[in-house]
């Protein structure tokens, strides 16, 4: 499937969003040699005890690297042989939900991560609802950390039931559920030998092939507000990205 795919990664805290995208970039050979070397060096002092920490490819702020979390929205552009992508890697903490909502406002598809040990959590549900409210029609639920549940098909089916219940509640039409391990690479870019019971496409192949051309383009002015700016009591401004319109200076909205 040709054409640009804009998607968001979201979900609850520590579900592995940055690690997943970092592993896609790493496995797809989309890094320069100096980037790979820097990743190896940074991982030695990171939060994974010396093992390669793929999340460092997305976590750019010093505070993010020190704490092992995502705070801001990290946008990355990459291209495979089949498709070009822009991904918005968003934070999972509740206090940064507004940043997640801004990332969702630009996306055609949402990749929502679910921890295989914990299942669907409150923040998982919140992010799915926000994505639906933002008009996203295509959803991929990546059931991550399958290595921590011994790649159990039974556990995967339990979480599938939770996701299907959520999808029904939110009236989600297009839903794909894929079992993955972002740290180990299972079903991220290639099929997993650890999960022979899953015979469908791995995540990257699904993203390369899905057709999102039916997404309805909204008309008129559309600007998700990320921040209210009040330098003093005489002024109130709004900051955020502008989509689906063309503006001119001094134009009245």
Q: Predicted regions: what is each one?
A:
Residues 2-98, 107, 142:
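P-loop NTPase switch module centered on the Walker A-proximal segment
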Residues 6-10, 19-21, 25, 113, ...:
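Helix-rich terminal scaffold detector
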Residues 48, 59-69, 168-175, 208-221:
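Active-site phosphate-binding and catalytic loops of NTP-dependent enzymes
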Residues 94, 106-125, 140, 147-154:
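Conserved Switch II/interswitch segment of TRAFAC-class P-loop GTPases
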Residues 110-113, 136-146, 167-180:
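Conserved beta-strand/loop subsegment of P-loop NTPase cores
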Residues 151-209:
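Canonical P-loop GTPase G-domain recognition
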Residues 231-240:
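Short, structured beta-strand/loop micro-motifs enriched in basic residues and often containing a Trp
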Residues 246-253:
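Single conserved hydrophobic/aromatic residue that forms the stacking wall/gate
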């Amino acid at each position: 499937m040709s054409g640009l795919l804009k998607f968001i990664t979201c979900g609850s805290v520590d579900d592995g969003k940055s690690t997943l995208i970092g592993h896609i970039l790493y496995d797809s050979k989309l890094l320069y040699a100096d980037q790979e070397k820097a990743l190896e060096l940074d991982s030695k002092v990171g939060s994974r005890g010396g093992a390669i920490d793929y999340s460092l490819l997305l976590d750019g702020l010093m505070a993010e690297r020190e704490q092992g979390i995502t705070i801001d929205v990290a946008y990355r552009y990459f291209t495979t042989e089949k498709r070009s992508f822009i991904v918005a890697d968003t934070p999972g903490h509740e206090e940064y939900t507004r940043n997640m909502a801004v990332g969702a406002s630009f996306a055609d598809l949402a990749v929502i991560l679910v921890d295989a040990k914990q299942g669907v959590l409150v923040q998982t549900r919140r992010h799915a609802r926000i994505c639906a409210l933002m008009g996203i029609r295509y959803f991929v639920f990546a059931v991550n950390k399958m290595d921590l549940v011994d790649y159990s098909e039974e556990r995967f089916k339990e979480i599938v039931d939770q996701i299907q219940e959520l999808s029904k509640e939110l009236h989600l039409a297009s839903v794909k559920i894929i079992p993955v391990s972002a740290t180990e690479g299972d079903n991220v870019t290639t099929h997993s030998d650890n999960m022979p019971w899953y015979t469908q496409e791995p995540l990257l192949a699904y993203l390369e092939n899905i057709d999102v051309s039916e997404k309805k383009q909204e008309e008129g002015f559309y600007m998700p507000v990320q921040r209210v700016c009040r330098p003093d009591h005489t002024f109130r401004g709004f900051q955020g990205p502008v989509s689906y319109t063309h503006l001119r200076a001094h134009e009245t909205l």
